[in-house]
């Protein structure tokens, strides 16, 4: 699908990138069956989320992603002015999201990850290979936003308590969970003949095998994190989501995480990032740089 309504005029680069970011969020939400996450079956481990809300939230972020891409074109280089413009746009996008969802945090982490990647792509649409995109996004993430004086989200608290790498550090290192695990697994599963939905599920599981998911740690502690990582490994070792043994292991993982009230929201955000990067080169083609 495409988030942008049909227009008789060719879409600009910023519009195409915003389309792709929103599509990645919707495709991630729709993917089923995801362990303990919102999907087409239901709300997973959540009581305040459902699929329609995830769709509405994703669509509300289209202007935010477009404006981030526009900012990249305006400033042209990685630096403090662009970083602080992104921070401001991200906070405005978060406010829009919260208005849309009546205060429910659906996509805060995704605004951060996809916002950086959208901006990185807009800085050089001719060089959209995963390593290049993630390197530019990482360089942006490493610049401090001087407008933010304190960091005290649930994720920040978990990082301090457990000494793990959170969403900020994942971005600053150029999204290793996406580059080194999700994208290679996506390609391996496709090459092995898996359908697209199974390949994407396997990519999510590959992220879950190693990610210190702060959403899981916040809700279920180390026990939940171990259950997520080890359970995801069992699914992939059993042949992935396309195999009967893998499906049984995936169902067991789903039930275990639900019992622990552990929802791997950080992994879901990174799957959306993976889908965005995976779709870049085929989606862009010839583009107009006009806003």
From Swiss-Prot:
GO molecular function ontology, one term from the record: triphosphoribosyl-dephospho-CoA synthase activity
Pfam family, one: CitG
Catalytic activity: 3'-dephospho-CoA + ATP = 2'-(5''-triphospho-alpha-D-ribosyl)-3'-dephospho-CoA + adenine
Record keywords: ATP-binding, Nucleotide-binding, Transferase
Entries under InterPro entries matching the protein: CitG, TriPribosyl-deP-CoA_syn
Biological process according to GO: prosthetic group biosynthetic process
EC class name: transferase
PANTHER family (UniProt xref): 2-(5''-TRIPHOSPHORIBOSYL)-3'-DEPHOSPHOCOENZYME-A SYNTHASE, TRIPHOSPHORIBOSYL-DEPHOSPHO-COA SYNTHASE
Family: Belongs to the CitG/MdcB family.
Annotated protein name in UniProt: Probable 2-(5''-triphosphoribosyl)-3'-dephosphocoenzyme-A synthase
Lineage: Bacteria, Pseudomonadati, Pseudomonadota, Gammaproteobacteria, Pseudomonadales
